[in-house]
């Protein structure tokens, strides 16, 4: 076949060019010079154009690659600028990836990414003898021509162009249908399942591999370093050596190494050790606080015994013994230092009398020596009543059984006290004083009755949860007199009273009685000097008179006597400093 006949048969869209340079009539070349390049196999595939035109359709989607081997003859560009030579990416063979390399930057990857007729991808600069003039034999780690043709194929992270990752030499036991480094990953996953660092150390390392075996090994060691890290310092030779060691040594080593040896979180046994040794590692101040709570709880447990004695035995003996035992109360003692400390240490949500405290309220120790005095009093004077209380009992008939609660004429008021100290002194001196507004209301009620009926006062301490007694108003209010015996000096005026009932009646016994003159609220939810209608007052008086009480302020009478003496001594000291 002659060159002229071939040129005449070319399509019109193609120029009179052949690969690797222009050919014209004037060059004087013979027809035989084109025989190696013009074979009959090129006729069925006339879709590709000259290789120098890298941006023609053959750059993107030619049907097939070259039909001849590059090893037949050396190439020449004919003086043209060196351009990369590309072939098609057609069918996949031998499991190689299908992608389009970047043609304009001369990557040393494969010339044709898809092999033809079972051959591997051709390298642009293979190190064979046919291309010895094009490059160095030691370039890009390609030692022999066989290795260049058999194992040098590229893997690109993207489907079109981009930076390519050089193909690596396959392992001895690695087939061509696996990407380089897959066996390394498989062995690394096996090492993770086994949970041992020995398998990771046997993983083969490939220099420059895209998936570095060193990183896998380090990850395996890091993931498995948590349990073995604690055993690494002793390094036993066999399992028998490990079994011969004490069982409790390894948790201790784990705890120390987990804290100071590494940055990893401590093993779960670390928390178990903390739970077991919480009492030893706790703050030192916690032990005194627990001891204080236990000491405070002791008089609380001792108080129910006098309660039982009061119910079964004679009231004076029981009341005296309880009065010696329970001594704390909310009103401030005369000593400011003790007051500030004790009130901060024990502030209940609701005030309850010390005798009725039980274990639910920790209002002990308003008096600095309350706990010690209660224990000493219970052992030293269990049967000796206070002389003042004995005198009061002899004069007054408290808690009478023949009380006439069915009133025909009379008025009843609720009295709310700030503290039981004032209740104690009201019983002791048979006097009372209310607020300025309360005094006017009580005085008007007393004067309105004019002896036609009694004026009863139902006493209750704020926040106590019970009524502590009933007294009868015996005189009008004297606004010009100041008693000077109350826990606070702000009260002015005074009137005489006579105490009839001295007992603790819980609010639960009276809560069902509602007052129509106070928004239909329970009688237990009343303010100071709140008047109770006569019919409702009869119900209240009946319940209080018939209620079988177990506690009263008489149980703490000795305690309040001592508090009063302390307050009087403090007042005298203040008066002496003021002079």
Swiss-Prot record:
Record PTM: Ubiquitinated by the SCF(SKP2) complex, leading to its degradation.
One Pfam short name: YTH
Biased composition annotated in UniProt, kind: Polar residues: 291-316, 372-383
Tissues where this protein is expressed: Highly expressed in induced pluripotent stem cells (iPSCs) and down-regulated during neural differentiation.
Subcellular location: Cytoplasm, Cytosol; Cytoplasm, P-body; Cytoplasm, Stress granule; Nucleus
Consequence of substituting residue 416 to A: Decreased binding to RNAs
Record region (Interaction with m6A-containing mRNAs): 385-579
CDD domains reported for this sequence: YTH
GO CC field: centriolar satellite; cytoplasm; cytoplasmic ribonucleoprotein granule; cytoplasmic stress granule; cytosol; nucleus; P-body
GO molecular function, one term: RNA binding
Effect of residue 432 to A: Reduced binding to N6-methyladenosine (m6A)-containing RNAs. Reduced ability to undergo liquid-liquid phase separation. Reduced binding to C5-methylcytosine (m5C)-containing RNAs
Task of the protein: Specifically recognizes and binds N6-methyladenosine (m6A)-containing RNAs, and regulates their stability. M6A is a modification present at internal sites of mRNAs and some non-coding RNAs and plays a role in mRNA stability and processing. Acts as a regulator of mRNA stability by promoting degradation of m6A-containing mRNAs via interaction with the CCR4-NOT and ribonuclease P/MRP complexes, depending on the context. The YTHDF paralogs (YTHDF1, YTHDF2 and YTHDF3) share m6A-containing mRNAs targets and act redundantly to mediate mRNA degradation and cellular differentiation.
Protein name, as recorded: YTH domain-containing family protein 2
Organism: Homo sapiens (Human)
Gene field: YTHDF2
